[in-house]
Curated annotation (Swiss-Prot):
Protein name listed in UniProt: Succinyl-diaminopimelate desuccinylase
Catalytically driven reaction(s): N-succinyl-(2S,6S)-2,6-diaminopimelate + H2O = (2S,6S)-2,6-diaminopimelate + succinate
Span of the signal peptide: none
Record-listed Zn(2+) 1 binding positions: H74, D107, E170
EC number(s) per entry: 3.5.1.18
UniProt similarity note: Belongs to the peptidase M20A family. DapE subfamily.
Organism: Brucella melitensis biotype 1 (strain ATCC 23456 / CCUG 17765 / NCTC 10094 / 16M)
Length: 395
């Protein structure tokens, strides 16, 4: 029996599966075959929810006496766009000049391929694992993230599963393998503001109420002053206006409605609830103190809608998990990785409620891009890091 010790072969098998969210595309089946070669038991639960597609997931475990390590990730990928723009077909796993091309190469089929290879090498050398390893893999990370990791964790917990630590194999390195380990993430909160006015002719503004004035005023109240100056482990909270829309193509008509959407990435100065309260306070004050039209007595009329579920800020403090991974990275790459909380959200935001979690994978320079690709040398390097981590974590 040949174990899946080669990360290049593993990744090629996964890339050739067109698993664009929500399609499974054969990726979980390919992964399950690799894991069963190593004696893992596997389940493929499918989760559903209103107004979202059904999603297939995978939970596989190889049990032993000792701590339980979870590797988490996703096999779904974003659409490749126009395939004519690619140097090589996005699902062909073509190799040229020591580089493999394909959608998901770094985000994050590459990380999965390397961890599979690392486990296989450990088993090949040592015969067993002094503990348990599980793979918690979803097909719903790039999509709504409703029927994926969040439900798979609860599903596993209800069946008696618990974990001592987790690694998420997202591409964490900005420039080169070994740059960065993610030990936490900022929270994320999104909302939409709608201001109602009175439509009218642009030449007769006294007969109308321009909601654009109101939306600009309210948005400005959220942009200034700054929410905070950052903390010891997190950069300053940051709000970005992502859309402003009036739905008006005519240049001589004052619209009757204006909307603006925003997203704020926040640090541990705030909880989602305290930040929502701060935003509401700023908007109410700005609406009360300003008008849509000079001489108008009533305040700005607006509605605030929170979009999606907020992601909560978190920071991992587990010394064994962080220290062992840091030492493994340094031993293989010769670099001491930065411990960071930068970047966007990931499924680690769900895992943190079940066990300590960190993130470490490939470099992310080409993720989601045309010609997404990974150096074969990086696949081997990441596999060696994971293999060393497994050996040291289980002692």
């Amino acid at each position: 029996m040949t174990l899946p010790v080669n990360p290049v072969d593993n990744l090629a098998a996964l890339i050739r599966c067109p698993s664009v969210t929500p399609a499974e595309g054969g990726a979980l089946t390919a992964l399950e075959k690799m894991l069963k070669l190593m004696g893992f038991s596997a389940n493929r639960p499918v989760f559903s929810d209103d107004n979202t597609p059904d999603i297939e997931n995978l939970y596989a475990r190889k049990s032993g006496n000792g701590p339980h390590l979870m590797f988490a990730g996703h096999t779904d990928v974003v659409p490749p766009g126009d395939e004519k723009d690619w140097k090589h077909p996005p699902f062909a796993a073509a190799i040229e000049d020591g580089v493999m091309y394909g959608r998901g190469a770094v985000d994050m089929k590459g990380g999965i391929a390397c961890f599979v290879a690392a486990v296989a090498r450990h088993i090949e050398k040592h015969g067993n694992i002094k503990g348990s390893i599980s793979f918690l893999i979803t097909g719903d990370e790039e999509g709504p993230a409703v029927n994926g990791t969040v439900k798979l964790l609860e599903w596993a917990k209800q069946r008696g599963e618990s974990w001592d630590a987790s690694i998420v194999g997202e591409p964490t390195n900005p420039n080169a393998l070994g740059d960065m380990i993610k030990i936490g993430r900022r929270g994320s909160l999104s909302g939409t503001i709608t201001v109602h006015g009175v439509q009218g002719h642009a030449a007769y503004p006294h007969l109308a109420e321009n909601p654009v004035r109101g939306i600009v005023t309210l948005v400005d109240s959220l942009l200034c002053p700054a929410f905070d100056e950052g903390t010891a482990n997190f950069q300053a909270s940051n709000l970005e206006v992502t859309t402003i829309d009036v739905g008006n193509k005519a240049t001589n008509v004052i619209p009757n409605k204006a909307t603006a959407s925003f997203n704020i990435r926040f640090n541990d100065t705030w909880t989602a609830e305290s930040l929502q309260a701060e935003i509401i306070s700023r908007l109410e004050r700005a609406a009360r103190d300003n008008r849509l039209r000079q001489g108008r007595e009533t305040p700005i009329k607006y509605e605030l809608t929170w979009r999606e579920r907020p992601s909560h800020v978190f920071l991992t403090h587990d010394e064994k998990l962080i220290g062992t991974l840091t030492a493994s990275v340094e031993a293989v790459t010769g670099k001491r990785p930065e411990l960071s909380t930068s970047g966007g959200t990931s499924d680690a935001r769900f895992i943190k409620d079940y066990c300590p979690v960190v993130e470490f994978g490939l470099t992310g320079q080409t993720m989601h891009m045309v010609d997404e690709r990974v150096a074969l040398a990086d696949l081997e390097g990441l596999t060696q890091i994971y293999e060393r981590f497994i050996a040291d974590f289980f002692g």
